[in-house]
Amino acid sequence: MKEEVQKKSSGAGKDAEIVKKKNEYLNTLFAAMKIETKVTIDYDEENCNMVFDLEGPEMGILIGKRGQTLDSLQYLVSLFVNIESESYIRVKLDTENYRARRKDTLENLAKNIAYKVKRNRKSITLESMNPYERRIIHSALQNDKYVATRSEGEEPYRKVVVYLKK
């Protein structure tokens, strides 16, 4: 695994050490998965953000079905990064610009579903989504005059319902 670190903050702190320690963790993780990966880290110490951009020939495997594998890896990396951190660091793991593409897809889905709800005058329940994806749907339709959204169900099966406003 290759690693590049870009640091936006010039301050040195204990959090900066985490950037170095994560290298061993990710090496072990990707070696176990038998995936060759180049990792670029964008670490903004001032805003407590760490973005891991992954590149390699088999990134589809890391993304998984609807990003579930990528979300799981992000969770594991976040746990590892924050174990020794003085302050909480927000971790984002991305590859092939997947997160932005998924956001665009969900925003388009929200608009299409809103159109169908208006046309058919019936509520539509979407498939189960993680909290981040549900938030994208809610945000995409929050300013619509004719439809509203709500989440129903229990995790991990919570779904967004798009319905006509009364």
Q: What is the role of each PLM region?
A:
Residues 1-166:
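RNA-contacting regions in translation and RNA-metabolism proteins
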